[in-house]
């Protein structure tokens, strides 16, 4: 058989073209010590800070400490079958989180694995590194749009704007999480994507929150990132960063995002545990020296982007738990100085039945007033001052039984206003209805109602106002003019008469001159 040299040469040339001379370099190391979720590794001389490393059993860790002779790695998954001498290799990647609309309605862990039993994540647009620089000053815009919480006390006196960072701070069991969840529930139909980051909570608490959001229909636009108390400290450490990375993708698309960190006290404790185990030098309260930077680099990623960048926003509601009301402790003062205001909840208000238990005197919103709706701003200007006077006189009235008429008026009005601010969980009020209620407070129409009937009277107003034409006018104009004020005055006189007519043994002359209602 004759050998066709041309065919052979063509085959050889074809093989040469297909041949790719790739050199794959793999840097491997080995475990020196292991324990408490921390692994010391030798041999990874070129590893990067925050780089993912892979162990021989398929587990992953993050290189957090780069030392001359070893690397301190924090574990992200089970490490019980690893031992001294086991091999470990670099991945060349930093830790990433999934992003995209496929995350809405899902519960995931900080490394992006679904934990809600609904199968794999779908419609994911990609993965993004969880550590990223915040946008600069020139890439931002000042806060100017309101973020409606649906909570009357907040929207009237402590308004929050889109792109603001408002701290919710208070002792345990004072309704901090409830305020955050009510704000999420109120975003229904407002084109705001929500992220709830659970840090160091019980599995049962996360399940309860998921159920509440599903029952209220809020889960359709919400993602839950959960790092529970039973998991490794490293997952609690990365959870908020994973959450804000998910939000940043939506913000870049020009969308509005609300993110809740519940809570950053446990986040700081998790970071302290990791730092001490990595033998980093402890500082005040045994926290490491960069604890302030930990929270500042997280919260600075929230904000309102400029029009050139799509005008998207991330509004952050970090939660901090205090011990015995001490807001001057290390972590609380750190986060207060980073954020744009705080809502302070107290045990005494909560136990007295004032819920949400917001202490208006110690709470502040530094940038929210620029974003407040005009109709609400017109009728809520004097509220904070009135309540401050009420609290002061209420304290003194406990020592004196003989009060003058003017003091009695301030005390009675203050007590009624506090009743108006009581609100049950998952029952948000729309901003037009809030403006109407505040109009009634400002013009003292609530003085005709006995204090123990204020809550029922409030429900009566909310029921009647939506059937009235003036509601649509306020909704359209988003401000009060002379015509609307005239119509609202007539509306309130009418509802006061109708409501008081249902009360047994009611004597209107005890509350003022009845001619005012004519």
From Swiss-Prot:
Keywords: ATP synthesis, ATP-binding, Cell membrane, CF(1), Hydrogen ion transport, Ion transport, Membrane, Nucleotide-binding, Translocase, Transport
Swiss-Prot/TrEMBL site (Required for activity) positions: 363
Location in or out of the cell: Cell membrane
Keyword Ion transport among UniProt keywords: yes
Main location: membrane
Enzyme Commission number(s) of this protein: 7.1.2.2
Gene3D superfamilies listed in its UniProt record: 2.40.30.20, ATP synthase alpha/beta chain, C-terminal domain (1.20.150.20), P-loop containing nucleotide triphosphate hydrolases (3.40.50.300)
Functional summary from the UniProt entry: Produces ATP from ADP in the presence of a proton gradient across the membrane. The alpha chain is a regulatory subunit.
Subunit-structure text: F-type ATPases have 2 components, CF(1) - the catalytic core - and CF(0) - the membrane proton channel. CF(1) has five subunits: alpha(3), beta(3), gamma(1), delta(1), epsilon(1). CF(0) has three main subunits: a(1), b(2) and c(9-12). The alpha and beta chains form an alternating ring which encloses part of the gamma chain. CF(1) is attached to CF(0) by a central stalk formed by the gamma and epsilon chains, while a peripheral stalk is formed by the delta and b chains.
Protein name: ATP synthase subunit alpha
The organism of origin for this protein: Mycoplasmoides gallisepticum (strain R(low / passage 15 / clone 2)) (Mycoplasma gallisepticum)
């Amino acid at each position: 058989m004759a050998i066709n040299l041309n065919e052979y040469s063509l085959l050889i040339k074809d093989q040469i073209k297909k041949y790719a001379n790739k050199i794959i370099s793999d840097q491997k190391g080995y475990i020196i010590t292991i324990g408490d979720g921390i692994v010391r590794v030798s041999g990874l001389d070129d590893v990067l800070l925050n780089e993912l490393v892979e162990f021989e059993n398929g587990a992953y860790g993050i290189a957090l400490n780069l030392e001359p002779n070893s690397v301190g790695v924090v574990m992200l998954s089970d490490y019980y079958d690893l031992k001294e001498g086991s091999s470990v290799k670099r991945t060349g990647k930093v830790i990433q989180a999934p992003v995209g609309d496929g995350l809405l309605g899902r519960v995931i862990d900080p490394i992006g694995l679904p934990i809600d039993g609904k199968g794999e994540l779908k419609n994911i647009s990609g993965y993004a590194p969880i550590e990223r620089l915040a946008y600069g000053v020139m890439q931002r815009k000042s806060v100017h749009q309101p973020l409606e919480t649906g909570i009357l006390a907040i929207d009237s006196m402590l308004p929050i704007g889109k792109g603001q960072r408002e701290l919710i701070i208070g002792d345990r069991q004072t309704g901090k999480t409830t305020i955050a969840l009510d704000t999420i529930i109120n975003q229904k139909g407002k084109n705001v994507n929500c992220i709830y980051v659970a840090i160091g909570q019980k599995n049962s608490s996360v399940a309860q929150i998921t159920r509440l959001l599903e029952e209220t229909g809020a889960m359709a636009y919400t993602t839950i990132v959960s790092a529970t108390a039973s998991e490794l400290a490293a997952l609690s450490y990365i959870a908020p960063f994973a959450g804000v990375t998910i939000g940043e993708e939506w913000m870049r698309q020009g969308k509005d995002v609300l993110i809740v960190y519940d809570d950053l006290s446990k986040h700081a404790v998790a970071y302290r545990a990791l730092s001490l185990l990595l033998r980093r030098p402890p500082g005040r309260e045994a926290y490491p020296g960069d604890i302030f930077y930990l929270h500042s680099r997280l919260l600075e990623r929230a904000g309102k982007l400029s029009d050139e960048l799509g005008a998207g926003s991330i509004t952050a509601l970090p939660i901090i738990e205090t011990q015995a009301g001490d807001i001057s402790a290390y972590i609380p003062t750190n986060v207060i100085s980073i954020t744009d205001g705080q809502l302070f909840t107290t045990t005494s208000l909560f136990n007295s039945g004032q819920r949400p238990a917001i202490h208006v005197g110690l709470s502040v919103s530094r940038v929210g007033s620029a974003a407040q709706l005009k109709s609400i701003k017109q009728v809520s200007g004097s509220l904070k001052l009135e309540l401050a006077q009420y609290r002061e006189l209420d304290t003194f009235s406990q020592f004196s039984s003989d009060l003058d008429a003017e003091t009695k008026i301030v005390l009675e009005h203050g007590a009624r206003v506090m009743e108006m601010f009581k609100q049950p969980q998952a029952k948000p009020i729309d901003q037009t209805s809030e403006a109407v209620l505040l109009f009634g407070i400002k013009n003292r129409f609530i003085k005709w109602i006995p204090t123990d009937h204020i809550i029922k009277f409030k429900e009566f107003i909310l029921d009647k106002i939506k059937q009235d034409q003036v509601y649509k006018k306020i909704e359209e104009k988003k401000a009060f003019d002379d015509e609307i004020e005239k119509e609202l005055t007539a509306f309130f006189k009418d509802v006061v008469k109708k409501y008081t007519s249902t009360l047994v043994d009611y004597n209107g002359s005890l509350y003022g001159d009845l001619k005012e209602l004519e």
